[in-house]
Each structure stands twice: as structure tokens, then as C-alpha cells.
A protein has these predicted regions:
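Short pre-active-site segment immediately N-terminal to the catalytic Zn-binding motif
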Residues: 51-67, 97-98
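Acidic helix-start/capping segments at beta-turn-to-alpha-helix junctions
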Residues: 1-11, 88-93, 124-135, 186
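Pan-zinc metallopeptidase signature
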Residues: 139-244
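A metal-dependent hydrolase signature that marks the N-terminal structural subdomain at the beginning
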Residues: 1-27
Length: 244
């Protein structure tokens, strides 16, 4: 399994460099880990069922991080996050869509915890938390940080849109129903996450259409190194680079 994950990282790096999204001397794994160290105060590893809190975080900051990461642990217990992510290896668009549900869930509950406890929280600690890691984004290639940030921000909006749709159109007021639907029948593309009506609304539902590669046999000496599926978010990064 580890070799499969390492191979996926290597293939992603090669493709990003080929498309001009990464400098040729860049190390995708090292850059990603560096960003995570600055951006993330803790994380839950569904593969080992373990939770980690970075050194230097305590008090209110640690509690806010715990609210987010322990949500992942609960979701994993219910929906097997590790199994779902492994099924999506090699399909960047589906992986991004699923991670948006995962991170949207964690972000929502964390924000609810912060709002509920706002009166007793340390204002300075919360200010530090809100800007945590923002400086490191300036030195990180867009192809790394933009999909990561989208999973938090767009994922939260996606789930909120689902609850609104269910309340208005199906008279369902239980906020957990939207989350359960999103996990048991996850969005199939980042397009559906970025435009929630294309997932939640039966009239506007827009599932991705598989494009079958219909090329002739590869010339002698050529071989397929990697195959992947890009969606709206990833293609926007490619066109953004081309326009720049």
C-alpha cells in the first residue's frame, strides 16, 4: 500500500512538472509536507486510526484543532475514510471531491465549537489560529495549496448548500442527513462540489461523463507512465498557468 501511495505521489509530481505547474527541480512531497507543517495544527490518520497534535499548540488552540480532527475520527468510524480514499487513488478529481466532504465536515464542526465557546476563548489565540499558515502559501506553488484550501472552504459550502436544499425541498431539518448523504453517496467531481446544485438538485444533477481514450497503439518505444482524471479545479490551475 505504501508503495502504491509513493508511486501516486511520484506520478503526480511528474505530471505537474510536465504541465508547468511545478518547477523541474521541485520536490512535491517535501513541499507538501512543509506546507502541512505550517498550515495544519494537527491531523488524523485514517490508515493508522491515530491523531497527532503539533508541538506548540495548547489551550484554546488545541481544543479547536481537536474539534476538527476528532470529527474525522468519528466520520472514519462511520464511513471508513481510509478505504474510500484508497479506492480513489489515481483519480484526482474524485479524490478532491471526497476530501471536500471530509474537510467540510471537520471545518463545520470546528466552527460550531468556536462559536459556541466564543465568550470564553482567548481572542489573541483565535486571531493566531485564523491566520495560521497564511504566510507559507505565498511561497508554495498554487497546484499544492489551492486544492487543499478548496477542500476546506468549498467543502463547507457544499454541505451547507445540501442542508439548505433538504430543508427547502424535502422538508428535512435534521442537519446530519446532508452529511450522511454526502458520505454514503459522495460527489463524483469537484464540479459538483464547486457548484452544489449539480449534486443536490435532481433537476440540475450533473454527473461526470467518462471520456474513453480512443488513441491508436503507442509508437514503438513509448509507454504509459501515468493516467489520471482532472476536473474543474485541476483544469483551472492548468489554464491559470497558461494565461499567466
Amino acid at each position: 500500500d505504501e508503495m502504491q501511495l509513493e508511486g501516486a505521489m511520484h506520478n503526480s509530481e511528474s505530471m505537474a512538472k510536465l504541465l508547468g505547474l511545478l518547477p523541474h527541480d521541485a520536490d512535491l512531497e517535501a513541499l507538501t509536507m512543509s506546507l502541512l507543517e505550517e498550515q495544519v495544527g494537527g491531523f488524523y490518520d485514517p490508515g493508522t486510526k491515530s491523531f497527532y497534535l503539533m508541538e506548540g499548540f495548547s489551550g484554546d488552540l488545541a481544543r479547536a484543532i481537536l474539534a476538527h480532527e476528532l470529527t474525522h475520527a468519528l466520520d472514519d468510524r462511520l464511513y471508513d475514510l481510509d478505504g474510500a480514499l484508497r479506492e480513489r487513488i489515481g483519480h484526482t478529481d474524485k479524490t478532491g471531491a471526497y476530501m471536500s466532504v471530509v474537510e467540510g465536515s471537520g471545518t463545520e464542526l470546528m466552527n460550531r465549537w468556536v462559536m459556541k465557546n466564543m465568550a470564553r476563548l482567548n481572542p489573541e489565540a483565535m486571531r493566531e489560529f485564523s491566520k495560521m499558515g497564511t504566510e507559507s502559501l505565498q511561497d508554495t506553488p498554487t497546484v499544492i495549496w489551492k486544492p487543499m484550501m478548496a477542500s476546506y472552504m468549498a467543502g463547507q459550502r457544499f454541505l451547507a448548500a445540501g442542508r439548505t436544499h433538504l430543508r427547502r425541498n424535502e422538508k428535512i431539518r435534521d442537519p446530519n442527513v446532508a452529511l450522511e448523504r454526502a458520505f454514503t453517496a459522495p460527489p463524483l467531481s469537484m464540479e459538483q462540489v464547486l457548484h452544489p446544485e449539480k449534486y443536490w438538485s435532481p433537476e440540475d444533477r450533473d454527473d461526470p461523463v467518462e471520456v474513453v481514450r480512443a488513441t491508436a497503439e503507442l509508437p514503438e518505444g513509448w509507454s504509459v507512465v501515468n493516467e489520471d482524471v482532472f476536473g474543474e479545479l485541476q483544469l483551472s490551475l492548468v489554464t491559470e498557468f497558461a494565461d499567466g
